[in-house]
UniProtKB/Swiss-Prot annotation:
Family classification: Belongs to the MoaC family.
Protein name per the record: Cyclic pyranopterin monophosphate synthase
UniProt keywords, alphabetically: Lyase, Molybdenum cofactor biosynthesis
Active site (UniProt): D129
Taxonomy, superkingdom: Bacteria
GO MF: cyclic pyranopterin monophosphate synthase activity; GTP 3',8'-cyclase activity
Chain's role: Catalyzes the conversion of (8S)-3',8-cyclo-7,8-dihydroguanosine 5'-triphosphate to cyclic pyranopterin monophosphate (cPMP).
EC number, UniProt record: 4.6.1.17
Residues involved in substrate binding: L76, C77, H78, M114, E115
Keyword Lyase annotated: yes
Length: 159
C-alpha cells in the first residue's frame, strides 16, 4: 500500500494542504503526555509549596494558550477556530509522575490532532520549566494522540 504525505506536493516541496473543498464536520482530538519526576518534586507541587506558585494551574493555562497558537509554531498547520480546549493534569504519585490529557474540539474542515498534541506538550514543558530549579532530570514521555474523531479518515483510537 502506498502512503502519500499530504504536506508534500508533486514536486517534493512542502506545502499547506488545500482544505477548500473538504466538508465541515465535528472534529475532536485527545492527546496525552507524562512528566516523570522524583517523589519530592511531585510532593512540592501537590502540597502547594512550590516557590513559583500553582504549577498545575500555570501548566493548564499554558497548554490552552498553546493549542490556540499551534499554527504559529508548526509551519503547515491551518489556523483553526477552536471551540473547546481542555487540559487536565493528574498526579500519579504511585509512578512519580503527572499525567496530562488534552482535548480539542471544533466544527471545521481539518482536524485538531496537532492542537491537542501541542497543548499536552506545552503543559508538560511548563511543568518542566517551573520545576527545573528543583530537579533537572525530569523526563517528558509518552506524548501521543489517544483518539480523534471526525473528518474523512474517521475515528482513530491509539492502541
Amino acid at each position: 500500500m502506498t502512503h502519500l504525505f499530504t504536506h508534500i506536493n508533486q514536486d517534493g516541496k512542502a506545502n499547506m494542504v488545500d482544505v477548500t473543498d473538504k466538508n465541515t464536520t465535528q472534529r475532536q482530538a485527545i492527546a496525552q503526555a507524562y512528566v516523570e519526576m522524583k517523589a519530592e518534586t511531585l510532593a512540592l507541587i501537590l502540597n502547594g509549596q512550590h516557590h513559583k506558585g500553582d504549577v498545575f494551574a500555570t501548566a493548564r493555562i499554558a497548554g490552552i494558550m498553546a493549542a490556540k497558537k499551534t499554527s504559529d509554531i508548526i509551519p503547515l498547520c491551518h489556523p483553526l477556530a477552536l471551540t473547546k480546549v481542555e487540559v487536565e493534569l493528574v498526579a500519579e504519585p504511585e509512578f512519580n509522575r503527572v499525567r496530562i490529557q488534552s482535548l480539542c474540539k471544533l466544527s471545521g474542515k481539518t482536524g485538531v490532532e496537532m492542537e491537542a498534541l501541542t497543548a499536552a506538550s506545552v503543559a508538560a514543558l511548563t511543568i518542566y520549566d517551573m520545576c527545573k530549579a528543583i530537579q533537572k532530570d525530569m523526563v517528558i514521555t509518552q506524548v501521543k494522540l489517544l483518539e480523534k474523531t471526525g473528518g474523512k479518515s474517521g475515528h482513530f483510537t491509539s492502541q
